[in-house]
């Protein structure tokens, strides 16, 4: 079963996304902010991280930079979700 780390500071959205992903057969672990997600990524070793951008403590973009520079997490696939639509924001997530 594929493990996904779901990172979303809005508890209601985190629950909605989690229920849907569980229904699709994924193993879900979740975090409410980027700081918690970094610890969970090392501990849980997910195959994919699905993350919001705008979060307290550490943004999704900053979390992505840290994940990419950390040996244990540099190869984990990350999908960033955001309502931001500027070209700069899109490039930041690449």
Label each PLM-derived region with a short phrase.
Residues 8:
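Conserved acidic carboxylate
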Residues 44-50:
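Active-site beta3 strand of CheY-like receiver
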Residues 14, 56, 65, 74, ...:
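The feature encodes the CheY-like receiver
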């Amino acid at each position: 079963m594929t493990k996904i780390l779901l990172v979303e500071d809005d508890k209601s959205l985190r629950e909605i996304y989690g229920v849907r992903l569980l229904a699709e057969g994924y193993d879900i672990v979740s975090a409410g902010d980027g700081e918690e997600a970094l610890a969970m990524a090392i501990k849980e070793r997910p195959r994919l991280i699905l993350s919001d951008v705008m979060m307290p403590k550490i943004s999704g973009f900053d979390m992505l930079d840290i994940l990419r520079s950390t040996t244990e997490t540099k190869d984990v696939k990350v999908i960033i979700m955001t309502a931001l639509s500027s070209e700069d924001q899109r490039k930041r997530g690449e």
